[in-house]
Structure formats: structure tokens, C-alpha cells
Amino acid sequence: MNTWRNLPGKLKVSLLSLHPRLRREALRCGEDLNAAERELFLTLNRYDLAHSLAMARRLGDDPLLKRAALLHDVGKLRHELNIFTRWLCTFLEIFLPGRLRQLCATVEEKARGEGILERIRSLPRGWRRGFFVQAHHGEIAGALLRRAGSAEELVRLVEEHQHEPRDEKARRLRQADDAL
């Protein structure tokens, strides 16, 4: 993702996140999800809620894509990815992308375990764990959605939303995510 190109979308979502009825809209849109998915969706912070809702509006013509839009960022674990770490990632992506790649590679080497959730827990709390969560939030979301009993096609779309799209639905999801 090119953060400079995406800046207008980020500003729009930042403004949407301030809307006093954001939570009410999230509750209404969350009715399309199963109970476990809804619980995951409602744990998103205000910015991620606004981002997911804006994506869902863009993709609302397809029920599967709408659900994927609502759930694609549930892997951005609120207690692991704080605002400081998010801003640090964005700053490094814009101004020092080589340093960001280097830091991510170092964190990647230190993560141990079988599954993605075990690998997160193997890292010390703080920016390292936050960087790992930011880099792997699609896979994390996929693991959480599997536990929630989500349909495999939904899990695949969410899990792979940071990767090169392999079909039309994945392309549309990625395009909406990159625009906002």
C-alpha cells in the first residue's frame, strides 16, 4: 500500500471515526454477522470501525464482500497494536521504508510457534509485538474467524487481503481497502 496515495482516504476515515453515531451504525451493520463475528467486529477501535464500515458501503452489492469488509481488520488486536505503534509504522513506511523492512524482518525472526496466535504470544509486549500484528493482521483475523465458525471463503478473503489478489472478489476487497 502506498500511504501517500492513500492519504485522502485516511483523512476521510479519520473524520468518519469522529461521528457520534458510529457505534450505532456498527451495531446495525453487525447484524449481518454471526454472534462470534459480531463480537470480534465490535472490538475494533473507532478508526478501524469507520474504515470497515466505509469499505462495507462500497462493497455492499455483494453480501460476502460486505462481511469481509466488516471483518478484514479484526486481526489488528487493540491491546497489541496501540496508536504509537501504528503511527510509527506509518512514519517508517513513508520516510524510512528500508528501516521498516529491516525491523519487521528482525521481529519475524524472533517470533516462534506453530500458529500465528502462538507466534504473537512468543514476542515481548510492546512495539515488536505491535509490528508483528500490523504485518500479519490478515492471518490473525483468519485464525480468529476460523474459531468463530466463519465460512471458509470469508476466512480466505480476510486472511489474504494484504496479499496480491487471486480472484475478482479479492481484488475488489483489496481495492476498497487501499482506497480508504
Regions found by a protein language model. Name each.
Residues 42-180:
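Divalent metal-dependent catalytic cores for phosphoryl transfer on phosphate-bearing substrates
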Residues 1-40, 160-165, 178-180:
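Non-catalytic interface/linker regions that flank or bridge core catalytic/transmembrane domains
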